[in-house]
Design a protein with these regions (language model features):
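N-terminal amphipathic/basic leader segments beginning at the initiator methionine
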Residues: 1-43
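Short alpha-helical segments and helix-capping/turn motifs at coil-helix boundaries
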Residues: 48-52, 84-88, 148-158
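Short internal beta-strands
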Residues: 97-108
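Residues at the starts of beta-strands that form the adenosine-phosphate
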Residues: 63, 99-101, 164
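Glycine-rich phosphate/diphosphate-binding loops that line cofactor/substrate pockets in enzymes
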Residues: 49-65, 93-97
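Histidine-anchored nucleotide/phosphate-binding helix
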Residues: 74-95
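Structural beta-sheet core signal
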Residues: 66, 102-104, 167
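An acidic, phosphate/nucleotide-engaging active-site surface
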Residues: 111-172
Length: 172
């Protein structure tokens, strides 16, 4: 019997399998951790691949919406990325913190409560920046068109009020 352990929420799920049922295991390539997430993020914002630095895309005083994954994608560690990004927007781009709205992209999941939102964006950011849960059933969603497959696209009502929309995310 072999046990497979998966992080889930604040805990883990253990799945015991008879070794005869296991056809193989797929492991990702090891990627060393960044020495400093804020420094690595700053370098990426200053030197994005094929684009000018973020500070050249923005103007002081603009409104910015940050769209971030919900707690179901917390393995992306938004809590490590959002604080230095908000600081960069303030310090390098001249975007006041009261001009930043974080939209938590919940998909069809229920929105997080205050504790989850504070975990996601950190207490420091939660106390300084507006954080809202996206609700896919909200009556004020804004229609923006259709996809190539004729699927209607509706977005959070906060996004059209922003001069810039920055989406953070990762693929599982």
């Amino acid at each position: 019997m072999k046990e497979y352990r998966f992080r889930y929420g604040d805990g883990e799920v253990v799945i015991p399998l008879d070794e005869g049922q296991v056809l193989g295991e797929l492991h990702g390539n090891h990627v060393p951790a960044a020495a400093s997430i804020p420094d690595t993020l700053r370098a990426a914002l200053e030197n994005p691949i094929g684009l000018p630095p973020l500070r050249q895309w923005t103007k002081p005083g603009e409104r910015v919406a940050l769209v971030v994954s919900d707690m179901s994608r917390f393995w992306m560690r938004q809590d490590k990325v959002i604080p230095p990004l908000v600081d960069y927007l303030r310090d390098e781009c001249g975007i006041p913190e009261d001009h930043v709205t974080i939209i938590v992209a919940n998909g069809t999941h229920d929105g997080g409560d205050e504790k989850e939102l504070r975990t996601l964006v950190t207490d420091g950011v939660y106390d300084r920046v507006r954080v809202v849960n996206h609700d896919c059933l909200a009556k004020d969603l804004v229609y923006v068109g259709t996809t190539a497959h004729d699927t209607a696209v509706w977005i959070n009502a906060q996004a059209p009020h922003a001069d810039r929309v920055i989406c953070l995310g990762a693929c599982p």
